[in-house]
Amino acid sequence: MSEHNSDIVHPPTKDCITRLKREFQEISKNPIENILVTPSPSNILEWHYVILGASNTPYEGGVYYGQLIFKYNYPLSPPSILMTTPSGRFETQKRLCLSISDYHPESWSPSWSTSSILLGLLSFMSDNEVTAGSIVTTNDEKRILATKSMDFNKKNKTFCELFPYLAMDE
């Protein structure tokens, strides 16, 4: 995912590393309902998440994989948010335009955490607001994509390596 990280020439600051490690420890102790997340083993600035489609939504049963790409000076700058799995809500492998993403650094608050970013993404996924990186589809189309999501994810090497318990055949 390094092609999405314009700060690849800048190593993360000490404050950035400390903050990201602390946030991962916090998420590990207090998991977010319907969301799994892990940093890349080789790059603390690259986190991978999975949103589990909530019951009674068009996403029910879906497994949606994506990335958070943090800037070297996080939390002073917001991360990029990308979705890999087709959901019918977001374009795949495009930066999402959210107030909690690098699309809107002017609205970013360093007090926001990875947990709040992921909760915001989950909330936005359930909303119908149209913005850069979002797409408009019917609920039926979203349901069809939900049923195909694991087959799609199983073709992604990084997904299978980081979330092997999800990628295993039942």
Curated annotation (Swiss-Prot):
A GO molecular function term, named singly, is: ubiquitin conjugating enzyme activity
Could you tell me what reaction this enzyme catalyses?
S-ubiquitinyl-[E1 ubiquitin-activating enzyme]-L-cysteine + [E2 ubiquitin-conjugating enzyme]-L-cysteine = [E1 ubiquitin-activating enzyme]-L-cysteine + S-ubiquitinyl-[E2 ubiquitin-conjugating enzyme]-L-cysteine
Q: What is its EC number?
A: 2.3.2.23
Naming one, the record's GO cellular component terms include: nucleus
- Keyword ATP-binding annotated: yes
Q: Can you supply a Gene Ontology BP term from the record?
A: protein polyubiquitination
Name of the protein this chain belongs to: Ubiquitin-conjugating enzyme E2 J2-like
Q: Which residues form the active site?
A: 97
- EC top class, in one word? transferase
- Pfam families to which the protein is assigned, alphabetical: UQ_con (PF00179)
The record's function comment reads: Catalyzes the covalent attachment of ubiquitin to other proteins.
| Pathway it works in | Protein modification; protein ubiquitination
PROSITE patterns per UniProt: UBC_2
